[in-house]
Amino acid sequence: MPRNVKKNPRDVTKLSGKPLAETIEPSPVLKTLQEGWVTSPDLIEGDLSFTLEVIQNMTVFLLANPNLNSSHLFRADILYDSLGVLSAPHAMEQSRDQGSGGRDQDTQKEDYVEPLPARSVPGFELKRTFVRRLIPRNRNLDRPLEQTCHFYEADELPPTSNSTNIAQSEQCESKAESPRQRFLVIYLPHVSSKEEMPWYHPLLRSLAFLYDFTPNAFPHSSEENKGTGIMSVHFLPYEEEPIQNRLERTLLALLSTHIRLARQTRLDEKPEGGNYNPHKDNVIPKHLVQDTYARLKLKYAADLCQNWVEDTEPTKHVFEDLSITAFLIELWRSMYGVVPADERSPDQKEQGKYDLKFPGFVDVACGNGVLVYVLLSEGYHGWGFDARRRKTWSIFPSSIQERLKEEIYIPKPFADVCTDSEMDFGVKTHTGMFPEHTFIISNHADELTVWTPLMAALSNPASPLPFISIPCCSHSLSGARYRYPPPKPNQKGSVDRPEDQEVEQNPQPAAGDLKALRAAKQKERTDTGAANSMYGSLTAKTVATAEEIGYEVEKTLLRIPSTRNMGVIGGRRRTTQEWTSRVHSAQASQAVGCSAPEAVRAAAQVLEWVAAVVQRECAREGGVEVAAKVWIERAKGLHKGQGKGNQPAH
């Protein structure tokens, strides 16, 4: 199906309709005797309402996110900021407490690139300089490109009037002008000839954006009438290089994208250059996941898609699982200091296929098994299980198939109240008692989503297992479809008890004023996972359940091709601290563990919390025994191939 075409943010009635080559004219700002800078009336858009701060904020945001301008690009890494605000990749890793994990220590040297000199622009003052590295999606087709970006500013006073005619002065009062504010950005690619220019970059020696803003002269202007602005594109072509149709389309698209993004820019909701969503790239820096994903995609995608045997379309599932795998590899690098097989030293490889520092993983409801296959192939030992065997398992090597189990999970609280005959499925069952420190992966596990933190805690109450849960379809603890009520605002970690099922309408803020109410409602609307959707409520329920039984929980938006892309991570920081102590402390057991009596008390507390959650959640269905019977019947259906196959795609 064709992609939805975004509405053009420009006033197309003012465009000439002629080819760009017929409308170019010298740039009044940048043209010199030595450099033939040009622009065009078709590359100018007026009557814009954006303040200078909005344009500057949007421009800085685009520095690290050029993928919004070109689908050929992943991102840009900021290598240099003259103000020291935006960080280079190695600095971002250090700020997130990333372990070196076997990374090349020369990375910091590679991140430094000398900026190209800034040209003098009459009337403008150089304010800031960046160097960025454009990262293509497919490095087999295109190479990364460094680019220097210079920011200039200028203030111009309006022309003075010598008229002493008071009546004329009063008549023109409504047209009074303030000093014009000007913001100029010049982009310089680090190439010595046009032959070195990658495909994704316009074939230009240099590119510039100019924004002129004239504030409203009256101080009490409304928010919508702060002034008017003009945005224009200027460029320095190569000599004797014709203006091709592709370049024309690119320049027009760049101008449209800048206008569209400026309309979406909010000055008070994000740090400079950062994401609007606080849950995006908040656990692992974007560049680490994207680089690993690109490597995995090149290594596995073609073979998996070519040999796909399921009835579903392969690319979506393959790319999604590779994206999640990339995130897990970088997550485990930061938690355990382990690296994929290709990065291990010869001494490490001699010790075996798997890194023994890694405690192992289990992929619950593993489905097609792609995630397990790639993780095992990358040198991380673990296994996966599902209620029924999938056709895809047959395409994997026998060593991988041995790690994919057709087993049914029966939660321990349910197994404790069921008879042996009720537990007889004709297939192996288990209660989720995994080895100590196992990392649990719950990827779109549906019935197991809310059970995931409970399963992790029950497996080792003295030291609950770390986990990641990526919610999808909403189910109660019995496995029946159930839509959880949205969480109450301003109650972090609260859970919906039976007596609290009714959600309060129009809650009042504690501060008691309209400003506080507006802020509370805005936060409620924008806080991912607190939305009133079924998915948002399920995510919030998973978080609340984990927090209630003692987990420190983090939410992060995963870069996967799915709308169900929220990752709920439990126990990451605690596990990272424990593993760091194990590696660096000569008295690891004393440094990491606690005394036996303390461990017993901690385990008893966790079990008490879990029991309270299970009893409360099952109460709506008649109690734990009734919920257990529902779970058993649904599990039998899943084993026969019913249920999940009829669920909508996500």
From Swiss-Prot:
Superkingdom, taxonomy of origin: Eukaryota
A Gene Ontology biological process term: tRNA methylation
Region of interest: Disordered: 1-20, 91-112, 481-513
Compositionally biased spans, kind Basic and acidic residues: 103-112
CC annotations in GO: cytoplasm
Entry's localization field: Cytoplasm
Pfam families membership: AdoMet_MTase
Enzyme Commission designation: 2.1.1.211
Keyword Methyltransferase tagged: yes
Reactions performed catalytically: uridine(44) in tRNA(Ser) + S-adenosyl-L-methionine = 2'-O-methyluridine(44) in tRNA(Ser) + S-adenosyl-L-homocysteine + H(+)
InterPro entries on file: tRNA_uracil_MeTrfase
Keyword terms, alphabetized: Cytoplasm, Methyltransferase, S-adenosyl-L-methionine, Transferase, tRNA processing
GO molecular function: tRNA (uridine) methyltransferase activity; tRNA(Ser) (uridine(44)-2'-O-)-methyltransferase activity
Functional note: Probable adenosyl-L-methionine (AdoMet)-dependent tRNA (uracil-O(2)-)-methyltransferase.
Family according to the record: Belongs to the TRM44 family.
Protein name per the record: tRNA (uracil-O(2)-)-methyltransferase
